[in-house]
Amino acid sequence: MIVRPAEPRDDEVLLRIESMAGQGDRIRLIDERDSFFSRARQFSDTILLVGENEATGALHGVVAAAVQRLLIQGQEHLGAYMFDLRSNPEANKGLSRAMFFLWRGLEERLMERGVEFIFGLIKEDNSRSYSIAQRMGAKACGERRFFTIPTF
């Protein structure tokens, strides 16, 4: 498998992967956008990688992070907000080697840039994502509550 930067030619496949990817059991967030890259453009410094089968060209997954300067207890740190990690349900079952290589590829690139840690958000009902993150060495450090107000 090849880990490489995502390119505009990947857009259609990445949107399809996003639409099929599991999000948990109770809440499904729907984000209708015309380009998979629109979220990455919200940040000034992003890394967006895909895992590509070198024999078939099929995309096995995607990982994305934004490098950010953060102030933690009065000290400036360089962190990376991981805002996407998805496997292609048409190509993968469970935690595959492809997702491992993608995660490691992101880590390597972030360490080269001097990033001290990676952080992200996982919905509490998304047990598969929790499992993947824990297998990769992540640990839960806090909790956020989001509230919605219906408008009708």
Q: Residue locations for each model-derived region?
A:
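Short amphipathic alpha-helix that is part of the acyltransferase structural core
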Residues: 1-37, 42-44, 81
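A short helix-loop-beta-strand connector motif used in the catalytic cores of GNAT acetyltransferases and
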Residues: 36-54, 61
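Conserved catalytic-core motifs of GNAT/GCN5-like acyltransferases
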Residues: 70, 121, 139-152
